[in-house]
């Protein structure tokens, strides 16, 4: 594509696809931003009915700390579900690692940093054990992790004697600590939190600039400049607003350390799933295992490392929870696997595998977190909270199932089809797969017309094979 062509692609009129391009394009991306819109609506509704408590700095910080471990579990769970598996043991594994880490510091005199290394190593060992059964023995992940859920729950209660084990103050920092204050700066905000927000916004601007530059260099079609500007302005406003919100919290508090750990994991795993060979193999195996194997993907190895990674993240989540609670107890981790699975499905993952994103799972987890928090602020009972969470999960998965039924367009697809001008998807077959199979076969090509005098005459066929023996 020439530079003239590239400029032409940027100077067209308004199209509905420009809005889609603002968010990355594709039905899965639109679904994620639909969920993000639902999250914003939930927050605003509870903000109104709670008299402004939902978005108060103290409450937002509390939500980040209280649900960070569920969001960390959702990061690993989405990879497991993309592969077509399920992990029911994450809550028990988190509790098991938590009690071992607490005992190692309280009774075995481990320093806090050595206890963290022990916990991560123990999570990797548990994950390797379960991954071995799933990947190389062939036992379904549902059965393996169900057994793990029972085994490690019992191990937690056996090792801890069904009592709470406290942890030292240094360890508490990873679950209940905050970014430090900088003395001598006369502003009513936490400076490290503001710096973190500015750096995040600057990285977002740089990333968008680099993306457009690469598109221009490759000659691919770019969205209009106003699309990139609007997207960057909106996202930077959200980031800087969050930085101001966290930085103006209770005296002595700022952005929590558990939130820093969560953000680091989100960035890391978003990169792994989107920009590495291993991430592409996860989607390939989850989408079509046989085709991936024929393409040379070692599906068993992918199964093994995905299961091991899930247990490592469960160990991290368990240690953060123990640090925030300042002790490890026998009831830690109960129901965590259900919250993580619900977050992944609400975030747009497919039950059949092959579809899902880290960002979508985080958004789904935040939906669950603010639902819980908002109903608690409004003094709803635990029974009502559970019923609402179940209804939200059912609706989210039901919408996904409806969108995938052959011959039925999704709501987003219907709007896109109605609003795009003719030729918007020229050259792309949008017929559902099931409908294609029912279409009539293409008509036979027309018989050739009379041959012109200028057309070359084909060579005469050798009819020697048709002659009778002995004929000349």
Describe each model-derived feature in a short phrase.
Residues 1-44, 164, 201-232, 241, ...:
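Cytosolic-side transmembrane-helix boundaries in multi-pass membrane proteins
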Residues 40-49, 53-108, 130-142, 273, ...:
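Single transmembrane alpha-helix segments in multi-pass membrane proteins
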Residues 51-62, 157, 245-259, 270-279, ...:
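Inter-helical junctions in multi-pass inner-membrane proteins, predominant
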Residues 66, 141, 164, 168-170, ...:
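Loop-to-transmembrane alpha-helix initiation sites
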Residues 85, 127, 307-320, 324-390:
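Transmembrane alpha-helical segments in multi-pass inner-membrane proteins
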Residues 109-150, 363-364, 368:
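Alpha-helical transmembrane segments within multi-pass membrane transporters and channels
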Residues 152-273, 330, 409-422, 428, ...:
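Transmembrane helix-bundle core of multi-pass membrane transporters
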Residues 207-222, 268-307, 468-470:
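Membrane-helix/interface signature in polytopic inner-membrane proteins
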